[in-house]
Amino acid sequence: QFITLSDRKIDQLTSSLQRWEKQKVRVPVYDDPKNKKGYIEWEMRPTYQGQALRVQDMMIMRIINDAAWRVPIYFAVTVSQQNRIGLDNFLDMQGLTFQLKSHRTSPVDTEKMYENLMMDVGPKEWSTNFNHDDFYSSMTESLQSGNSIKNVENEYNQGWSKNYQPGYMFRNLGNESIYFNKQTKRLLQNYRSAYVQLAFTYYVDYQNQLKKKNTSEKKLVELKDKIIRTLHKMGEKIPQKP
């Protein structure tokens, strides 16, 4: 627990608006070699009719301050820019989330994003023949036996694990017996957007490499390959049509 507000103070916050004028907000940073200043600072504008802050904005600031960098803080990619309260210079995209960093950062963490989007977790099939009972029973059996989880091809990183595994499961997306409503289909486009964003970031890096006098041919080939593989994986996991 790191939120230090009492229930009474929370009730007071939710029952009224806090008048606010555009100003700089500063949060201290501890032991970050990438932040020589020892703090992050951003401009916080009024979020309610140009005069006040909404309760959710005050809570975000409170969470950041009270967490004191002991736990990671994330924003979903579906959170609008306005609701990120001006923190964009300290947020990097890692897939379906932005992570708040204790220093200025690039908009996309290509290494983390590539790891999340390109790793295969769960059955490699596009779930056209996914069987719920078989999948969960096999994963449970593997965990109970204490064995490392492997799929039928004897490959790692394919099911439940006691340890963190990067990546997303695209389970049942190709199963025509499963109904997806319009809202779900719209939300699934966030996956495609993540792949496109990653590929575009690699493309920008590729163009920047071309402008250098001593361009590394190996680096160019590597970036081009990543662009192609990223878009190919998007087509495999989130195709335009089943």
Label every model-predicted segment.
Residues 1-242:
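ER/secretory pathway lumenal C-terminal domains and tails of membrane proteins involved
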